[in-house]
Amino acid sequence: MKNDVISPEFDENGRPLRRIRSFVRRQGRLTKGQQHALDNIWPVMGVEFNDAPLDFAALFGRDAPVTLEIGFGMGASLVAMAKAKPEQNFLGIEVHSPGVGACLASAEEEGVQNLRVMCHDAVEVLHTMIPDNSLNMVQLFFPDPWHKARHNKRRIVQPPFAELVKSKLKLGGVFHMATDWEAYAVHMLEVMSSLEGYRNQSASNDYVPRPESRPVTKFEQRGHRLGHGVWDLMFERVK
């Protein structure tokens, strides 16, 4: 795996562009299990960043619906979803290599075959490697809320990002978000509701109950015990 988690963007003259990122690089130490997974499973399930669009049928060895998860953390819920839906293909993107290693190790342990992972900036991957009109679902679960007002601009859910996601979804594809930070949930709802071409799947035009397809994380279980809320939003591409 290349150590290029964060790559610069360049303009037509080759000058680097400065872009506000929604994450902070926190690599941390790899456990032996994570390192083993990166050394041995990455060559099979890992996807290196490059400037060529992905051919999903070739990547997965079959033509099947594709779900993209952005920022999968340690990968437990992503692996669980891939295992629960073997008829679908899953691609996960995470910028922190310990999480990628943990996800790969879990996938091997669970015998999951329909999962591929990347260790790179998801926005660059979307721009460069994900073909337009190719995804059945995009998942963004518990992104950094950047709760301080001066940091709100770092939140990944902004109109340009949501428009980018829409361009990658097939007609009828769904952008599924979840957050445990109420102010961010309100922000997500405002952003998504302001855009043409999306339809809120909520009957009340705000939030949806957690679908069974999204596993409850350990962090989320702890939050429930403490009385914390979680907000799910699902917006369908309609044009």
UniProtKB/Swiss-Prot annotation:
Its EC number is 2.1.1.33. Pathway: tRNA modification; N(7)-methylguanine-tRNA biosynthesis. PROSITE patterns: SAM_MT_TRMB (PS51625). InterPro entries: SAM-dependent_MTases_sf, tRNA_(Gua-N-7)_MeTrfase_Trmb, tRNA_methyltr_TrmB_bact. The active site is at D144. Gene3D superfamilies: Vaccinia Virus protein VP39. Residues 150-155 are annotated as: Interaction with RNA. GO terms for molecular function: tRNA (guanine(46)-N7)-methyltransferase activity. It catalyses: guanosine(46) in tRNA + S-adenosyl-L-methionine = N(7)-methylguanosine(46) in tRNA + S-adenosyl-L-homocysteine. Keywords: Methyltransferase, S-adenosyl-L-methionine, Transferase, tRNA processing. S-adenosyl-L-methionine binds at E69, E94, D121, D144. HAMAP family: tRNA_methyltr_TrmB. Monomer. Catalyzes the formation of N(7)-methylguanine at position 46 (m7G46) in tRNA. NCBIfam families: tRNA (guanosine(46)-N7)-methyltransferase TrmB. This is tRNA (guanine-N(7)-)-methyltransferase. The gene is trmB.
